[in-house]
From Swiss-Prot:
The active site is at C124, H125, E155. This is Probable glutathione-independent glyoxalase hsp3104. Its EC number is 4.2.1.130. One of its GO terms (cellular component) is cytosol. The lineage of its organism: Eukaryota, Fungi, Dikarya, Ascomycota, Taphrinomycotina. Its main location: cytoplasm. Catalyzes the conversion of methylglyoxal (MG) to D-lactate in a single glutathione (GSH)-independent step. May play a role in detoxifying endogenously produced glyoxals. Involved in protection against reactive oxygen species (ROS). Gene3D superfamilies: 3.40.50.880. It is found in: Cytoplasm. It comes from Schizosaccharomyces pombe (strain 972 / ATCC 24843).
């Protein structure tokens, strides 16, 4: 079974990137649970025409879509038995920069899944949670691992560096460098790009969401 997780602490942040791996996993007949906190509203960056395919736009507009049904039935991380799941999937959107680093129940749950041989996957800004997840030795699971995520060049192209400075955020390049990871940039910032290192799977951006989900399944079955 799959635990596909996305927490949102601030109401202005929800990413339809969540919908893309949701659909990929659903097509595989995967059983999973969404975890969400608080009220969710749209992040304009995530629902712009350039960010979404036609099918994604249709899913966003159709409140009867299975994606929205899953969100309505989402649980808090504290109410989930993580031992029941074999994949932890953290989807991005800039909102995760606010809440993932302090989401201790998610950190512990992901560590539980990882300790059982499960897969930890994350895409776009979702990987911001990874340095917070510890292995059995107490070190971050990304130490010495090869990863990717939404990179600094992409933030610059979106003119978001002033926002990073305002909130004292570190770019994901910097964050993973400090965590002792080998961060790999896609050839172009918005290319479909995924890195798999053992049971750790990361994707660079919205275009990589479906590929990251597929890679997570492949890693689980390898």
């Amino acid at each position: 079974m799959v635990l596909f997780m996305k927490t949102v602490q601030r109401p202005e942040h929800i990413s339809l990137k969540s919908c893309i791996p949701f659909k990929s996993l659903q097509r595989q007949g995967i059983v999973f649970r969404l975890s969400v906190r608080m009220v969710m509203l749209a992040d304009d960056h995530s629902i712009s025409d350039s960010a979404l395919s036609d099918s994604d736009k249709n899913a966003f507009k159709d409140k009867n879509n299975d994606f929205w049904k899953a969100i309505k039935n989402a649980k808090n991380a504290s109410d989930i038995n993580f031992s029941d799941y074999s994949i932890f999937f953290a989807a991005g959107g800039h909102g995760t920069l606010f809440d993932f680093p302090s989401a201790t129940n998610l950190h512990k749950g992901a560590a539980k899944i990882y300790s059982m041989g499960g897969v930890i996957a994350a895409v776009c800004h979702g990987p911001v949670i990874l340095p917070c997840i510890k292995d059995s030795t107490g070190f971050s699971i990304v130490k010495g691992k090869t990863v990717t995520a939404f990179n600094e060049i992409a933030e610059q192209q979106m003119n978001l560096m002033p926002t990073f400075e305002k909130y004292h955020f570190k770019t994901l390049n910097k964050l993973f460098q400090e965590a002792g990871s080998n961060f790999v940039d896609p050839q172009e910032p918005f290319d479909d790009f995924v890195k798999t290192d053992g049971k750790l799977v990361t994707g660079a951006n919205p275009a990589s969401a479906a590929s990251t989900a597929k890679a997570a399944l492949n890693s689980l079955n390898s």
